[in-house]
Amino acid sequence: MHTVKLLCVVFSCLCAVAWASSHRQPCHAPPLTSGTMKVVSTGGHDLESGEFSYDSKANKFRFVEDTAHANKTSHMDVLIHFEEGVLYEIDSKNESCKKETLQFRKHLMEIPPDATHESEIYMGSPSITEQGLRVRVWNGKFPELHAHYSMSTTSCGCLPVSGSYHGEKKDLHFSFFGVETEVDDLQVFVPPAYCEGVAFEEAPDDHSFFDLFHD
C-alpha cells in the first residue's frame, strides 16, 4: 500500500513538472546582444557568417557578413527595423542603399509569444565544471510562411544558442557564438545618410527575415 502511495506521489510530481515545462512562458532577449551568427542550409551549405547586433527593446537588427570567409563579389550588410517593417540592404563601399518593406516581422532573435516550451536540456556534461550548458528548446509555427521553427536559448539569460527554420522553399540552421549582452556602437542601428530619400521597393506580403539567406 505504501509503495502504491509512493508511486502515485512520484507520478503526480512528474506530471506537475511536465505541465510546468510545457506551459513555461517564452523568455525575452536581453536589451542588447551581439556576437557571431552563422547560417547554413540543412544540406550543409554555408550561406552566411558574420557579426550581428540586436536591440530587443527597439526590435532592430544588424548583420554584417564576414568578408574574410566568403568567396563572393558582394557581401551582406543588412539593417532591419522590425517594428517599422523596413529592411535596408547597405553597400558601404559604393555608398548605396536599397530599402524594402517587410510585412512579416517575426524572426529568430526573439522568441515569438506563442512559442511552445519543448524541453530543458544540458549540452555537454552537467556534472563537470564548465563543461556543460543548460538550454531551453522552444518551437512553433509561422502559418503565414507555411513554416515551423525551433529555437534554443540559454536557460539563464535567454541568450540565443541555435535555431532552425523549415519552410516550403528552404530549410535553414542558425548558430550563435561569442554572444555578449552589449553592443559597442549603437550607431549600427541607424541607417547611413545615403539611405535617406531612397524610395521603398515594394515586397510580397510574405517577404521575411528568412528570405535574406539563400544559396
Curated annotation (Swiss-Prot):
Pfam families for this protein: Ependymin
Signal peptide start-end: 1-20
Tissue spec. comment: EPDs are synthesized in the meninx and secreted in the cerebrospinal fluid.
GO cellular component: extracellular region; lysosome
Keyword field: Calcium, Disulfide bond, Glycoprotein, Secreted, Signal
Carbohydrate attachment residues: N71, N94
Coiled coil residues, start to end: none
Record localization: Secreted
InterPro entries: Ependymin, Ependymin_CS
Keyword field contains Glycoprotein: yes
Gene Ontology MF term list: calcium ion binding
GO BP annotations, alphabetical order: cell-matrix adhesion
Chief location category: secreted
PTM (free text): Different glycosylation variants are known as EPD-beta and EPD-gamma.
Biological role stated in the UniProt entry: May play a role in neural plasticity. May be involved during axon regeneration.
Family: Belongs to the ependymin family.
Quaternary assembly: Forms disulfide-linked dimers.
Name of this chain's protein: Ependymin-1
Organism: Carassius auratus (Goldfish)
Lineage of the organism: Eukaryota, Metazoa, Chordata, Craniata, Vertebrata
